[in-house]
Amino acid sequence: MAIQLRSLFPLALPGMLALLGWWWFFSRKKDRLSSSDKQVETLKVGPAIKDRRLSEEACPGVLSVAPTVTQPPGREEQRCVDKPSTEPLALPRTRQVRRRSESSGNLPSVADTRSQPGPCRDEIAKVELSLMGDKAKSIPLGCPLLPKDASFPYEAVERCKQESALGKTPGRGWPSPYAASGEKARETGGTEGTGDAVLGENVSEEGLLSQECVSEVEKSEFPILAPGGGEGEEVSHGPPQVAELLKKEEYIVGKLPSSFVEPVHSEPVKDEDALEPQVKGSSNTSDRDLAGELDKDETVPENDQIKQAAFQLISQVILEATEEFRATTVGKTVAQVHPTSATQPKGKEESCVPASQETSLGQDTSDPASTRTGATASPSAEALPPKTYVSCLSSPLSGPTKDQKPKNSAHHISLAPCPPPVTPQRQSLEGASNPRGDDNFVACMANNSQSVLSVSSLGQCSDPVSTSGLEDSCTETISSSGDKAMTPPLPVSTQPFSNGVLKEELSDLGTEDGWTMDTEADHSGGSDGNSMDSVDSCCGLTKPDSPQSVQAGSNPKKVDLIIWEIEVPKHLVGRLIGKQGRYVSFLKQTSGAKIYISTLPYTQNIQICHIEGSQHHVDKALNLIGKKFKELNLTNIYAPPLPSLALPSLPMTSWLMLPDGITVEVIVVNQVNAGHLFVQQHTHPTFHALRSLDQQMYLCYSQPGIPTLPTPVEITVICAAPGADGAWWRAQVVASYEETNEVEIRYVDYGGYKRVKVDVLRQIRSDFVTLPFQGAEVLLDSVVPLSDDDHFSPEADAAMSEMTGNTALLAQVTSYSATGLPLIQLWSVVGDEVVLINRSLVERGLAQWVDSYYASL
């Protein structure tokens, strides 16, 4: 039990703190509700409250403020009162508001439902109410100023001009409903920061006009309602035009874009049809809103401090977590370029506040009017939970309008990284609505997706949809280009060979690995399915244990190639190969030599183990094999061909050769002379595939357009040549005659030599050379021409053709000639009689018998 309590103790303290926090929050909430009910009862008096409720119902965001955040009556009088005018301005007001919504390029569309009404509508409505009456009364105690984002300088200038012109008309006049706009426009001129020269001129002109407006304050003599404490006071009703002005003002202001007021924490905009019934709503709703706002103003400083601390703590944790996550998935170079790139949903309000906004906000804090404005606007911002800052994407990039060009475009994206999150919560919220921060926000968004370069280069982002599309589509492009940039180029001295191995790698792999890879494909063709030779075996090579190595710049072709072949009995072949070829792979990796098993179907009891490599690696491979197979004979049986070969030939594995010491059935397909023949093994499994190959080659090379051999023609190249009866056979070039543009070819399947023009030969497809060459060139053993002749006589040739034509024969290899051709003994079976053809030619007097004739040569 003690162990369980000890494990639960670390969780007890945070839980207690959480419970205390919730208790404190709900207790404060109950106190506010009880106090608000009392205040609502005291406010339900007189017809004057009804008129005030009509104006306040249209703008429930901000009502009256506490006395601690209001100005003295004298100062408020200067800010809120304008010179009188002679007639109501309902129609000009409608035109001005509509033009404001059209000309502002930084504002979202009217249909934007993510923003909602805020202090702007309340301030305008209260100013209108305060200026209506017959005689001037005391200036209200709580005449709050418009928030920073409530108006634009050029609109205020136009208002003041119209009010000044109308106010000079003699006679009875009515105060303008836009008295506070001139002073507020001057106040917001620093925080707007649109960067346009026209706006700057309007701000300076506005300052002069505002002074004229203030100079006419003392002339106004109209009753004004004091929403802060004048509960018993009445409001004198003006002419019927005032009611129209109020209704139109409420309707038009309700349609204004909500980015005037609160860009983030706000309620959805209500429909236009619902605005009129709301003005005529019950007094209970209005009183509750009034009481709620009065109580919220008292708790603004405490709530600001608590939420600001919690907001900064959560944002810092999320930012650190996302940076750590991206550091593991993105390369170091990208991480250094974008150190603050993070895609958390809750941290955008911090990372996307530009430095220019912070400076403007810092200047505004010194102004007491702006402090009161922030205190007035904060209750509506704090009344709702924070929402995702997606609304920032709707305002930065808007299309051009009739009055002005779009102020923000993808062309203005800054490549500077986003500033760190060091601003308080209120500054972040106010900065998010600053039209000046749109460019910097787009830059921050591009940094978060690591697509700054792509977005700035495209320059086509004219709306939020295309901006968000580029944010997603440019990520892969930047990632791939970053990967390419991080790949270092090869040094000048590092030149790859044709086999893909660099010179510097040869020092690790060893000298023999270079030529081993070069000669991989030379001896792999024609091997059986049990052969362990593979073309891509160089991929499995590792660094050998041998201490020998060559220099990085050495030429691997200069290394001497050693070929060692040993006979392996049939019962040891499986052990030598190993399960799934593991032991042969072990031998390759350990010794560094190339090793494969040649499986010949004619030698059923013996197979050949082929070893290629340098002397050191061959010795190491033989040593490993000898340790495991002590009864195995490691004598080299490989007989390299003489350098003076008269007839170049393909590698042995590409030819279907006759087995040594084994009698096999053959048929003679071509006869050069009586002692020189070409035979086929018609009992071999691959023999039947030759017929199908002939048909495919005939269909292929009967079509025009097959390319010819490149010139000069290379000796030993395999090609397709015309055969008998219009057929196309496989052939090998054995000699070239450049003076006559002719070559001598040897048919590799049907035997025989022929001299043809080069242009009649065709290039052969790779799939046509996979079948082993069926024609085996042989010589008769112990048979030579007569002493008087250098060649066999025509009679000998005819007799040989008669004995071998159209019949199956038995052949056995006895030895090899000096040119490498096998010497055979040939028997014909006639009934039960077996006739040795070699002896038969001698007995007929067409040849002479000579023992070891080719050996003596």
Swiss-Prot record:
Q: Which InterPro entries does the annotation name?
A: KH-I_AKAP1 (IPR047368), KH_dom (IPR004087), KH_dom_type_1 (IPR004088), KH_dom_type_1_sf (IPR036612), SNase_OB-fold_sf (IPR035437), Tudor (IPR002999), Tudor_AKAP1 (IPR047367), Tudor_domain_containing (IPR050621)
Outcome of gene disruption: Knockout in diabetogenic agent streptozotocin-treated mice results in significant cardiac dysfunction which is accompanied by impaired mitochondrial function and increased cardiomyocyte apoptosis.
Going by the entry's taxonomy, the superkingdom of the source organism is recorded as Eukaryota
Q: Where in the cell is it found?
A: Mitochondrion outer membrane; Mitochondrion
Please list where the region (PKA-RII subunit binding domain) is annotated: 306-319
Compositional bias annotation for Basic and acidic residues: 74-85, 286-299
- An example Gene Ontology cellular component term from the record? endoplasmic reticulum
One Pfam family of this chain: KH_1
Gene3D superfamilies (alphabetical): 2.30.30.140, 2.40.50.90, K Homology domain, type 1
Protein keywords: Endoplasmic reticulum, Membrane, Mitochondrion, Mitochondrion outer membrane, Phosphoprotein, RNA-binding, Transit peptide, Transmembrane
According to UniProt, the tissues expressing it are described as: Highest expression in testis, heart, liver, skeletal muscle, intestine and kidney, followed by brain and lung. No expression in spleen. Isoform 1/D-AKAP1A is expressed predominantly in testis whereas isoform 4/D-AKAP1D is expressed primarily in liver. Expression is decreased in hearts of diabetic mice (at protein level).
> The Tudor domain covers which part of the protein?
712-771
On subunit structure and binding partners, the annotation says: Interacts with SLC8A3. Interacts with CFAP91. Interacts with CLPB. Interacts with NDUFS1.
Q: What is known of its domains?
A: RII-alpha binding site, predicted to form an amphipathic helix, could participate in protein-protein interactions with a complementary surface on the R-subunit dimer.
Which PANTHER family does its entry note?
A: A-KINASE ANCHOR PROTEIN 1, MITOCHONDRIAL, TUDOR DOMAIN CONTAINING PROTEIN
Which protein are we looking at? A-kinase anchor protein 1, mitochondrial
Q: Which organism is it from?
A: Mus musculus
Gene transcribed to yield this protein = Akap1
